[in-house]
Amino acid sequence: MSQSNQPDSPVTQTQAEEAVRTLLRWAGEDPTREGLLDTPRRVAEAYGDWFSGYRDEPREYLERTFEEVAGYDELIVLRDISYESHCEHHMAPIIGKVHVGYLPRGKVVGISKLARVVESYARRFQVQEKMTAQIAQCIQDVLQPLGVGVVVEGAHECMTTRGIHKRGVSMVTSKMLGSFREDARTRAEFLQFIEVGGKR
């Protein structure tokens, strides 16, 4: 978490559990009844998992690279990276997939590291557009490739379980940097590789 986003003092597990009890009472429940006695602890632990990205520095995952790639200088694409996030407006789940591509400039990174970058940004309160840009910019800043493309698909529970109640709707966002933005052929090749919403 960046320094500017940190609270003045860390919130304890006990304080987090008490906040859950307050929400239960606000909803009209009795947090002392048997079925809810362990709920505050369980919710706090679940939040610790769901928002573990705040304890990560995504750039560190990309620092170990491989420069001996036998002159490989073509597109590298990792598609269908599943993710789970939560929208910062309603704290409702966002579930979807991320597709990442980059055109290396002399060095590549292990593919699991790209997935870890996605996971690190997803496990925070997010806006999909922002998350898309964060993933792309992180890869561009650390690997300094010729270009980066990121496409994110997301189903937003804040739209399906409340408000307009529209199911089966998927939001798609993209961020193109470098050659992916400037060269239509590179961009088209990337989009053909991932075929968002199409048959594979």
UniProtKB/Swiss-Prot annotation:
EC number(s) recorded for this UniProt protein: 3.5.4.16
Keyword terms, alphabetized: GTP-binding, Hydrolase, Metal-binding, Nucleotide-binding, One-carbon metabolism, Zinc
Residue positions binding Zn(2+): C87, H90, C158
Pathway as given in its UniProt record: Cofactor biosynthesis; 7,8-dihydroneopterin triphosphate biosynthesis; 7,8-dihydroneopterin triphosphate from GTP: step 1/1
Gene Ontology annotations of biological process type: one-carbon metabolic process; tetrahydrobiopterin biosynthetic process; tetrahydrofolate biosynthetic process
Domain of life: Bacteria
Example of a GO MF term: GTP binding
Reaction catalysis annotation: GTP + H2O = 7,8-dihydroneopterin 3'-triphosphate + formate + H(+)
Coiled coil regions in record: none
UniProt xrefs under Pfam families: GTP_cyclohydroI
One CC-aspect GO term: cytoplasm
UniProt subunit comment: Toroid-shaped homodecamer, composed of two pentamers of five dimers.
Family affiliation: Belongs to the GTP cyclohydrolase I family.
Listed name of the protein: GTP cyclohydrolase 1
Organism expressing this protein natively: Xanthomonas axonopodis pv. citri (strain 306)
Organism lineage string: Bacteria, Pseudomonadati, Pseudomonadota, Gammaproteobacteria, Lysobacterales
